[in-house]
């Protein structure tokens, strides 16, 4: 046993043993309790970052603890391998995305193995492998059969640089999330999945079937699903198109949750793509120009909420459904064609957006709701009470005046229904999922286009439709459209005539919507999932970042419900518990160039400048460059403030990297990087090693039957007290306090002073064995080696499956306890009494102790109050 702690030697030896024993391969076992713990699969970008290290160490600690506790535990790993970054890297380096991706996978797999993670690599998947994405295609065809998947033309966000459709969430301030290019609105055909059909169930299950999820995430999902109760009704009109037909049968429909304000409508606004807007554009060049301008904006609610609200009058009017007065129609850049009917009623007096719009363009404002005790209505300054539907009562509303919000909504809905113009309706913010992407590196959509029969599904026997792996993107659109081999020999399944394949590929969120089920049965060539999923699902613990709170998690839940309805799985929800780990942060430093741009510097290259309070205010580099301080932010490439896990492992070892990320903050909290604390974690492990080395020459003593002296009893009391807390912390996944508990154990062991009793050696050996097991899930290499070197494996087996230590309740009992001593309610000292002392015995000891005699100064005691286990108060 090397007297010095050499992490590389320790870790390579442990990993070699685990590899030789195939230690982490797991099989289904109905006789054992199962536990499925999984981290969100990584994108193979080339290197792990510290966020990965933290995420997977959390998973690994849970896995190892539960395995020692008797569970059959699955911790798998795979690669979210499709996506645009691979195409961009290929474009930059002139290599096929497949080559770039698989090289990255090989490198990152090695990094994960160097971390010592308890991953069952026999279940590894890569979403770019045809054996995986075949089942994406298969389920897509099943969805087509069931009407869940369908094709339509719709206005989408188009990134003109990447030449692809962006999801709403990928549009930030009107620009593409990756390229920064101004997003355009385009109408293109594509495939959609009817997630909206599952909206009610998704909402209900969010509220009632996810007790192990953070409330924050559930609220985000509820808001995204967005259930609204309101009234859908029509403004009628007699506007005809060029052929003399009534546009939309003479009805312009809107939906509102504020039907109580219908008498305050002074205008309506339609989306730039609405049929009335298109008609107006043929009559007025200003309208046509405005519609063209709107095409450069995004189609997201988030963007519309922040951009300037603009519009133009169309010159058209529609008839108010109650008053029958003519209402002017505007085209508004804030109205989305994909939401509702692409038209909204304008009630400036009681909607803040409409209020600003009306004041900007001089549109009439009519107050129709009054809130008692509020100031006079100001037509030029918005006040929050204008939109208060809970306290408001209708005014200036003819037959609907004097009603509360609920009363007025019901009355208006009834009146509109009698006219045949409207009805109560539930609407959803959730929109069907557009899965078509104009990209190469993704799952091919299994459709064949025939001149005679149109879009025809690929027969199941011909799956998978294999993606060519020899494409090197050149930046000009989708390479699949130009790849002759992809279309060679393709014929229509209906008529047998030459045809072409669909060149759109699937959104990569499809790949990540069910991979966790494929882990359960990854080699099955005959079925998407089988018995393995029946055993392992639902997943017991899912771990990933809060950034996936909406899309990935919602899509995975939807996908699970579709698979359930197709009889593939038996669960309603895929993830029983969810942990969203905090981000890893680091300092940000930069200097500005001549144009004011920021040039970032790695923190290790900067000597910080501190103010009088010790706060960082700037810094300098080795060449004297003055550096500005940008605060603390998420580690990332753009700010150059990341820490390479490989560098950390090479310098300190994987156990130190793991220990530091677990000790510094609770799993769900952000972790602020501190190089000095990393060094501290390493020093602690060196102490553990040195203590183990010191015990290596001591002959193992079998535990049991020894008489323990006071020193040994005190040690065992401390050890089992800490063990009880550590076990509790493991159960609630508070790993930072698990590590601090291990540090307390080491302090107790190092501070143990034997008093010569027969049980001294046994107590010390027991304590060290408990320390190694408590620390093992966090730092498996060093503890594994010490466990073997010290002979614990001969008694309890390999540390992998050693039984989790049980708290000895008897060891927690104390001969004496310490009580606070008070005189007239003021703390005057401490009183040690036998643990089982009676009230009378405690009173006698209190009255005779030195502290009481000193402060009483001869005064007799009038009363003695004893609070068991806490204090004794003598009243004089």
Curated annotation (Swiss-Prot):
GO molecular function, one term: aminoacyl-tRNA deacylase activity
Reaction catalysis annotation: tRNA(Leu) + L-leucine + ATP = L-leucyl-tRNA(Leu) + AMP + diphosphate
Enzyme Commission code: 6.1.1.4
Residues spanned by motif 'HIGH' region: 42-52
GO biological processes: leucyl-tRNA aminoacylation
Subcellular location: Cytoplasm
Listed GO CC annotations: cytosol
PROSITE patterns in alphabetical order: AA_TRNA_LIGASE_I
Motif 'KMSKS' region per record, residues: 634-638
InterPro entries named among the record's database cross-references: aa-tRNA-synth_I_CS, Leu-tRNA-ligase, Leu_tRNA-synth_edit, M/V/L/I-tRNA-synth_anticd-bd, Methionyl/Leucyl_tRNA_Synth, Rossmann-like_a/b/a_fold, tRNAsynth_Ia_anticodon-bd, Val/Leu/Ile-tRNA-synth_edit
Entry-linked NCBIfam families: leuS_bact (TIGR00396)
Family: Belongs to the class-I aminoacyl-tRNA synthetase family.
Protein name per its UniProtKB record: Leucine--tRNA ligase
Organism per entry: Variovorax paradoxus (strain S110)
Lineage of producing organism: Bacteria, Pseudomonadati, Pseudomonadota, Betaproteobacteria, Burkholderiales
């Amino acid at each position: 046993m090397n007297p010095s702690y050499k992490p590389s030697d320790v870790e390579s030896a442990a990993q070699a043993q685990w590899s030789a024993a195939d230690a982490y391969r797991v099989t289904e076992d109905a006789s054992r309790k199962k536990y499925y713990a999984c981290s969100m699969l990584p994108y193979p970008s080339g290197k792990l970052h510290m966020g990965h290290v933290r995420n997977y160490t959390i998973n690994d600690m849970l896995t190892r603890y539960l395995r020692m506790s008797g569970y059959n535990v699955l911790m798998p790993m795979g690669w979210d391998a499709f996506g645009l970054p691979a195409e961009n890297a290929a474009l930059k380096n002139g290599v096929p995305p497949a080559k770039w991706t698989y090289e990255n996978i090989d490198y990152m797999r090695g990094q994960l193995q160097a971390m010592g993670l308890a991953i069952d690599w026999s279940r590894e998947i890569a979403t770019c492998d045809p054996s995986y994405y075949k089942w994406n295609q298969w389920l897509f065809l099943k969805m087509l059969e069931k009407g869940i998947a369908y094709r339509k033309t719709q206005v989408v966000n188009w990134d003109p640089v990447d030449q692809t459709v962006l999801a709403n969430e990928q549009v930030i301030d009107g620009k593409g999330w990756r390229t920064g290019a101004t997003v355009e609105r385009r109408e293109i055909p594509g495939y959609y999945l009817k997630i909206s059909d599952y909206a009610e169930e998704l909402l209900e299950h969010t509220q009632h079937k996810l007790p192990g999820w953070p409330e924050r995430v559930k609220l985000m999902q509820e808001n995204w699903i967005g259930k609204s109760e309101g009234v859908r009704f029509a403004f009628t009109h007699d506007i005809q198109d060029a052929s003399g037909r009534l546009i939309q049968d003479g009805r312009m429909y809107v939906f509102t949750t504020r039907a109580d304000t219908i008498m305050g409508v002074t205008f309506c606004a339609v989306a730039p793509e609405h049929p009335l807007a298109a008609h107006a554009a043929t009559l007025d060049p200003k309208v046509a120009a405005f519609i063209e301008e709107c095409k450069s904006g995004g189609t997201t609610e988030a963007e519309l909420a922040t951009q300037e609200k603009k519009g133009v009058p169309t010159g058209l009017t529609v008839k108010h459904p109650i008053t029958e007065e003519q209402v002017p129609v505007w085209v508004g850049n804030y109205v989305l064609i994909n939401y509702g009917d692409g038209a909204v009623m304008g009630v400036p007096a009681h909607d803040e957006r409409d209020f600003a719009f009306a004041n900007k363009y001089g549109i009439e404002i009519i107050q129709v709701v009054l809130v008692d005790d509020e100031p006079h209505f100001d037509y030029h300054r918005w006040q929050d009470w204008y939109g208060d539907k809970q306290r408001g009562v209708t005014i200036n509303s003819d037959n609907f005046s004097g009603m509360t919000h609920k009363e007025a909504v019901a009355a208006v809905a009834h009146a509109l229904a009698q006219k045949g113009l409207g009805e109560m309706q539930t609407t959803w913010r959730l929109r069907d999922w557009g899965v078509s992407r104009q990209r190469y590196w993704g799952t091919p959509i299994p459709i064949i286009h025939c001149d005679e029969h149109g879009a025809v599904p690929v027969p199941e026997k011909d799956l998978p439709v294999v993606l060519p792996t020899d494409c090197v993107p050149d930046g000009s659109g989708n390479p699949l459209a130009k790849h002759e081999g992809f279309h060679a020999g393709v014929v229509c399944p209906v008529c047998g005539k030459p045809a072409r394949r669909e060149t759109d590929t699937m959104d990569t969120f499809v790949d990540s919507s069910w991979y966790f089920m494929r882990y359960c049965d990854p080699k099955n060539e005959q079925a998407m999932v089988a018995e393995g999923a029946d055993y392992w699902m639902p997943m017991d613990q899912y771990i990933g970042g809060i950034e996936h709170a909406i899309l990935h998690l919602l899509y995975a839940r939807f996908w699970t419900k579709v698979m359930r309805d197709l009889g593939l799985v038996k669960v309603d929800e895929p993830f029983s518990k969810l942990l969203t780990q905090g981000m890893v942060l680091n300092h940000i430093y930069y200097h500005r160039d001549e144009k004011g741009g920021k040039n970032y510097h790695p923190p290790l290259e900067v000597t910080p400048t501190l103010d009088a309070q010790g706060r960082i205010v700037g810094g300098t580099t080795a060449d004297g460059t003055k550096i500005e301080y940008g605060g603390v932010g998420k580690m990332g490439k753009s700010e150059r403030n990341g820490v390479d896990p490989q560098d950390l492992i090479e310098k300190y070892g994987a156990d130190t990297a793991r220990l530091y990320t677990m000790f510094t903050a609770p799993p769900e909290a952000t972790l602020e990087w501190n190089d000095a604390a990393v060094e501290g974690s390493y020093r602690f492990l060196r102490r553990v090693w040195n203590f183990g080395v010191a015990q290596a020459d001591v002959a193992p003593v079998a535990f049991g039957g020894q008489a323990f002296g006071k020193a040994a009893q005190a040690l065992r009391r401390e050890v089992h007290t800490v063990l009880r807390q550590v076990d509790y912390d493991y159960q609630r996944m508070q790993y930072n306090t698990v590590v601090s508990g291990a540090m307390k154990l080491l302090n107790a062991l190092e501070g143990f002073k034997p008093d010569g009793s027969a049980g001294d050696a046994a107590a010390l050996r027991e304590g060290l064995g408990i320390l190694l097991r408590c620390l093992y899930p966090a730092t498996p290499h060093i503890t594994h080696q010490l466990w073997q070197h010290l002979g614990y494996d001969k008694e309890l087996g390999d540390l992998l499956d050693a039984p989790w230590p049980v708290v000895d309740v008897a060891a927690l009992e104390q001969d004496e306890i310490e009580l606070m001593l008070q005189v007239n309610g003021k703390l005057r000292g401490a009183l040690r009494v036998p643990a089982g002392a009676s009230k009378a015995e405690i009173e006698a000891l209190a009255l005779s102790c030195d502290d009481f005699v000193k402060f009483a100064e001869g005064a007799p005691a009038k009363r003695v109050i004893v609070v068991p286990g806490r204090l004794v108060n003598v009243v004089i």
